[in-house]
């Protein structure tokens, strides 16, 4: 393990909120975009001819969602915020000490707010479209009870969430770290293609909260928030136990090559960013 290159995560609450709000805003905005686009894709697939196979529809939705996730992760803003896009991922990184307390709370709030914004925007758009008679389309997020049963759905959530976090930890802390975003996007696409018949809840608690914001948690569906949270926490233990690793470089799926990092960062890309910033400062001081 190298030295911690960024201590931004150690700022007091007020300072963190004042200085790190751009990263929080990015998380909220990107999740709103993701929910809106996936929802519109789902609506479009519902409009395919009746003989279209459900698997074909899910394939197209998954393909579009996976491409969008990859684009968000590797975008300049995505590299800045880390593109968690999921409270369970943020809390897993918080557990390994890479995210400060203030940032973890603010990220979760921003993620839920972004999902709410995306759901409301989706409903508003569908309400004014001529073909707005389809139910709110959000693959892997809507059905209150699956055909496979709630127990199976919860197990699928738990396993998939653990697989997602283990993949992120294993790849982002290896020589393959540049491929983490691509592999994550492929896994997201695969889940949207293959998992809905078993689990329509997904592995993102923020999305489930946003969809159920109308008060349907009275029937106990809030328990569906637990499997993805527990699955990703267990993935941290699996990373340490089975892969025999303790070191986590940073809390980003794709790291930026310039600018600050608000996490407790030990990533080589941050070292490069600091070196570039130092060279630029020296150049400006010489020219002054």
Regions found by a protein language model. Give the residues of each.
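Membrane-interface helix-loop junctions and terminal tails of multi-pass membrane proteins
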Residues: 1-288
């Amino acid at each position: 393990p190298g030295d911690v290159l960024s201590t931004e995560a150690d700022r007091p609450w007020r300072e963190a909120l004042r200085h790190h709000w751009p990263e929080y805003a990015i998380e909220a905005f990107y999740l709103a975009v993701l929910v809106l686009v996936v929802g519109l894709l789902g609506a479009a697939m519902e409009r395919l001819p009746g003989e279209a196979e459900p698997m074909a529809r899910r394939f197209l939705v998954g393909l579009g969602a996976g491409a969008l996730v990859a684009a968000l992760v590797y975008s300049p803003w995505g590299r800045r915020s880390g593109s968690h896009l999921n409270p369970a991922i943020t809390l897993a990184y918080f557990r390994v000490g890479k995210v400060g307390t203030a940032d973890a709370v603010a990220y979760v709030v921003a993620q839920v707010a972004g999902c709410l914004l995306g759901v409301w925007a989706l409903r508003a758009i569908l309400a004014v479209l001529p073909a707005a008679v389809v139910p709110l389309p959000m693959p892997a997020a809507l059905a209150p009870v699956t055909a496979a049963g709630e127990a199976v759905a919860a197990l699928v959530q738990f396993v998939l969430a653990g697989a997602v976090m283990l993949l992120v930890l294993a790849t982002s802390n290896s020589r393959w770290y540049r491929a983490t975003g691509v592999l994550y996007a492929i896994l997201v696409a695969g889940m949207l293609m293959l998992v809905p018949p078993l689990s329509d809840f997904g592995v993102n608690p923020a999305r489930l909260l946003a969809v159920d914001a109308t008060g349907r948690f009275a029937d106990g569906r809030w328990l569906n928030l637990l499997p993805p949270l527990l699955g990703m926490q267990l993935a941290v233990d699996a990373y340490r136990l089975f892969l025999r690793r303790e070191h986590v470089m940073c809390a980003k799926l794709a790291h930026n090559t310039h600018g600050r990092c608000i996490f407790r960062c030990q990533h080589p890309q941050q070292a490069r960013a600091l070196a570039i910033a130092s060279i630029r400062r020296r150049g400006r001081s010489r020219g002054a």
